[in-house]
Curated annotation (Swiss-Prot):
GO terms of biological process kind: cell wall organization; pectin catabolic process
Reactions catalysed: Eliminative cleavage of (1->4)-alpha-D-galacturonan to give oligosaccharides with 4-deoxy-alpha-D-galact-4-enuronosyl groups at their non-reducing ends
Residues with attached carbohydrate: N215
Signal peptide range in chain numbering: 1-17
Region (Disordered): 215-241
Enzyme Commission number: 4.2.2.2
Protein name, entry field: Probable pectate lyase D
Cofactors: Ca(2+)
UniProt entry tagged with the keyword Isomerase: no
Top class in the EC scheme: lyase
Length: 241
């Protein structure tokens, strides 16, 4: 009886740790980034989209390496980004990313590159990010709601050393985070703020909110503090997932 109970316990633990990516409905390989026009919506039908290339690791790619380019006000929804790509999805202006899943993150999953937001990430998820999942280079507000992230470096990072810096704001709700280094990284000296709602849970995440001293010189930004503050707005501890 004990062995049977132990087996059920192990199976339950394994199930909880399983990244809940939807089943793929097919695959599409683009020769070049697919552009979602301003104000338009692309419904991926839960197919897996890639570029037919191997991940180049943490070497900085560029716009030409993305799978999707989303123009101002565009929406990408119901899509799976495959492992055969480098730069994932770029938002070149305010965008909505809804129920988009990353099979495996290469350099970054989602890069916010232009405009002033808002950038809305609703549902979906990503796994296997050595560093960042969401990289925020432009200014404005990011809203992350209902996202699932497993095995990651940082869920969200406000650019720490971009040539042109901005005050950035991120709000996180209903996020499920499992096995990561840092949930959020912001530059408090540049006016960034992060708000993490108690609906977010974190299991085996080493740091919840880290403040950096951002710069525009290209130097590696200095980590100055972690934990709740005027800039990192949340209550400890977050619940386990």
């Amino acid at each position: 009886m004990y062995q049977k109970s132990l087996l059920f316990s192990l199976l339950a633990t394994s199930a909880l740790a399983q990244f809940p990516i939807p089943d793929s409905k097919g695959s599409v390989t683009f020769d070049a980034p697919y552009e979602v026009a301003a104000g338009k919506t692309y419904d991926g039908g839960y197919k897996t989209y890639g570029r037919g290339v191997s991940c180049s690791g943490q070497g900085e790619g560029g716009q030409d390496d993305a799978v999707f380019l989303i123009q101002e006000g565009g929406t990408l929804k119901n899509a799976i980004i495959g492992s055969d790509q480098i730069e994932g999805v770029y938002c070149l202006g305010a965008c909505t990313i809804e129920n988009v899943w990353w099979e495996a993150v290469c350099e970054d999953a989602l890069s916010l590159k232009g405009g002033s937001g808002p950038y809305n990430i609703i549902g979906g998820g990503a796994q296997g990010a050595d560093d960042k999942v969401i990289q925020h280079n432009s200014g404005g507000q990011v809203n992350i709601d209902g996202f699932t992230v497993y095995d990651f470096g940082k869920l969200y990072r406000s650019c720490g050393n971009c040539d042109e810096q901005h005050a950035r704001t991120v709000t996180i709700r209903n996020v499920v985070a499992n096995s990561g280094k840092t949930l959020v990284g912001i530059n408090s000296n540049l006016g960034d703020t992060a708000s993490i709602d108690s609906s977010t849970c974190a299991t085996d995440v080493k740091k919840i909110c880290v403040e950096y001293k951002g710069n525009n010189s290209g130097d590696e930004p200095e980590e100055v503090s972690e934990g709740p503050s005027d800039a990192c707005q949340y209550s400890e501890p977050l619940s386990s997932c």
